């Protein structure tokens, strides 16, 4: 049976080869005019410089944690941790590298060939990120399992993935939103120049941010969820069904890669049809393949359909959360239209209505996650919950592709604007970008849902490791109550840190843009050249400086509670952070997405269009929502997963401290 697990690394390699072929396809396309190439080079170099600087800092963090895991747990687990960190880094770097090539080629295709070709290039660029995530994730999990056969060592691989993911999400989120807020407030509100105008000194930093935040950061987030779901399913499967239960999640993930590759061939645009339909078709085809395959595999491996039903619950919940997110964040539905209407009376009512929509949007996804948990548990117990997480994430390859398509299309529009291409080109890139905003919002909803199930599955694995099933978590125990309070507080405190980081960085950016408008002659007339480099440097330095405290907090908090208060209190912390974290992430991501699309709805000519008072109010709402949806909200996903993985990996250490009762 264990030899069947060889299928996992083989399909991982297939995914990487497919990513390479897509990368080669993108690179062969025409990159457009000299001006387009020049702007694309600015974006590419800025993104590369940020990642290299970020990785230099991460080397120190990873080295310290490597030594801690080696001495505290085992050196084999430490090596797996190092492998997880390395694979997550490589996935982010490769995906972002291709995205910064695909953006200018998408703009060139829109200029020369029209919508269909532009969609194909943008999606292919995103698919490279998707295939790198699943390919390296499954390759790593497969290798570690085949070499060691130990789920405890495998949890080290998950810890490595989680560590990189947090810094990539937080650092990338701070970078992109510092630039975005600075560019919007000074450019649109104060000066009245359009988005992506080459006269705006922050516009290159804004476009760089799309790549480091929404491509590399998002990819690292889902890489962590993907790996974490597989690890938790293997851990619980080994306990429930021995070797069969451990190998099954690896094979399911392998089938998911094949399904994602098949789905990419169904993403075909039409000059007159909506690109959104093409992207949805690919996702639904992949999901259908996984459903059919899971029914067959469940019958063959277990002699029944219990595992398949759990997987299907996860898949369906993931798809439905994406649809619900679209309802709350798309300009086609009443919630966004209501915010746009409120913008007519000023920025205060815009912000109030957006907050209300964000809070409202938590209800249905939480109920869906709850139904998924109940259904998965009834189908196959605790193992079923872990399989539901694997099922939801089985099509990650195409989910990430659709999500990463968004920032590529956004960059293409920016390059078209800065290069002075005809309005017809911008019309095509605007259509692609509008779809990208919706898919990005849906992707964030999916990421939150998958984070909730993954964190829950990892929590169950932790409970198994410290024998909480024997004693239970006593809600009348004062230590557990303290753990719940601390856990419930952490997502709020973490969000405060990241929001404040964006605010401080945006302040510096705004001051720099204002300084350039004052001191560089002819900049607003188009005769003077802005200093793009200084704005890129501000975002880079701010992101690198501000990402450290939130990152360290996510590791220290569970370690401190586990050692001081014991394993039951740590269980309370994980439960508290899971509940408030999922709610905060949904609220912030959906409120931010709704504000963003309310602004775009007005820019289409509604409520006075661009330059109107309603538009100015909507820009303020969008600016408030930027760190909500692209920094704090997505980072909470990683916080709740990373703390659970830290608890799982260091469970043996906590058990040694006063027999798991803690020092206090």
Give the role of each language-model region.
Residues 1-664:
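Hydrophobic packing and interface segments
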């Amino acid at each position: 049976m264990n030899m069947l697990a060889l299928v996992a690394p083989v399909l991982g390699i297939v995914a990487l080869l497919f990513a390479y072929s897509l990368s080669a396809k993108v690179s062969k396309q025409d990159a457009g005019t000299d001006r387009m190439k020049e702007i694309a080079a600015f974006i590419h170099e800025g993104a590369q410089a940020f990642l290299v600087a970020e990785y230099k800092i991460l080397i120190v963090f990873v080295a310290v944690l490597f030594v801690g895991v080696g001495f505290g747990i085992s050196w084999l687990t430490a090596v797996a941790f190092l492998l997880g960190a390395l694979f997550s880094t490589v996935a982010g770097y490769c995906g972002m590298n291709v995205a910064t090539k695909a953006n200018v080629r998408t703009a060139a295709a829109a200029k020369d060939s029209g919508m269909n070709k532009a969609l194909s290039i943008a999606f292919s660029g995103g698919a490279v990120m998707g295939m790198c995530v699943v390919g390296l994730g499954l390759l790593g999990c497969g290798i570690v399992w085949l070499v060691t056969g130990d789920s405890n060592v495998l949890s080290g691989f998950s810890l490595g993935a989680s560590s990189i993911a947090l810094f990539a999400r937080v650092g990338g989120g701070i970078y992109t939103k510092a630039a975005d807020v600075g560019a919007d407030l000074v450019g649109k509100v104060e000066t009245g120049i359009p988005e992506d105008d080459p006269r705006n000194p922050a516009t290159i930093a804004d476009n760089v941010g799309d790549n480091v935040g929404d491509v590399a950061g998002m990819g690292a987030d889902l890489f962590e969820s993907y790996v974490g779901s597989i690890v938790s399913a293997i851990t619980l499967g080994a306990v429930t069904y021995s070797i069969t239960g451990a190998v099954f999640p690896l094979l399911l993930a392998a089938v998911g890669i094949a399904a994602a590759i098949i789905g990419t061939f169904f993403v075909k645009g039409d000059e007159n049809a909506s690109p959104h339909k093409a992207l949805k078709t690919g996702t639904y085809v992949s999901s259908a393949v996984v459903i059919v395959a899971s029914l067959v595999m469940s019958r063959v491996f277990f002699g029944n359909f219990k595992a398949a039903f759990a997987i299907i619950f996860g898949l369906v919940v993931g798809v439905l959360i994406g649809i619900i997110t679209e309802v709350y964040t798309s300009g086609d539905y009443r919630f966004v239209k209501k915010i746009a209407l409120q913008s007519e009376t000023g920025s205060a009512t815009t912000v109030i209505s957006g907050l209300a929509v964000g809070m409202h949007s938590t209800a249905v996804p939480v109920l869906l996650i709850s139904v998924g948990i109940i259904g998965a548990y009834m189908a196959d117990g605790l193992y079923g919950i872990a399989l539901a997480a694997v099922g939801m994430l089985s099509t990650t390859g195409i989910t990430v592709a659709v999500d990463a398509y968004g920032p590529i299309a956004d960059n293409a529009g920016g390059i078209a604007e800065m290069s002075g291409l005809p309005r017809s080109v911008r019309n095509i890139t605007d259509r692609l970008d509008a779809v990208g905003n919706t898919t990005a919002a849906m992707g964030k909803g999916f990421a939150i849902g998958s984070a909730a199930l993954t964190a829950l599955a990892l929590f169950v694995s932790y409970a198994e490791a410290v024998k909480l099933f024997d004693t239970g978590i006593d809600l009348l125990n004062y230590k557990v109550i303290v753990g719940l309070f601390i856990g419930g507080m952490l997502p709020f405190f973490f969000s405060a840190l990241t929001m404040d980081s964006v605010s401080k960085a945006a302040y510096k950016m705004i001051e720099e843009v204002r300084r350039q408008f004052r001191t560089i002659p002819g900049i607003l007339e188009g005769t003077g050249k802005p200093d793009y480099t200084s704005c890129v440097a501000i975002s880079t330095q701010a992101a690198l400086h501000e990402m450290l405290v939130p990152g360290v907090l996510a590791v220290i908090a569970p370690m401190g509670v586990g050692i001081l208060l014991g394993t039951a209190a740590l269980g309370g912390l994980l439960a508290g952070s899971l509940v408030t974290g999922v709610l905060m992430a949904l609220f912030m991501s959906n409120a931010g997405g709704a504000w963003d699309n309310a602004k775009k709805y007005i820019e289409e000519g509604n409520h006075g269009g661009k330059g109107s008072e309603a538009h100015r109010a909507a820009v303020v709402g969008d600016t408030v929502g930027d760190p909500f949806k692209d920094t704090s909200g997505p980072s909470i996903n990683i916080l709740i997963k990373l703390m659970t993985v830290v608890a799982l990996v260091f469970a043996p250490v906590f058990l040694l401290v006063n027999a798991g009762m803690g020092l206090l």
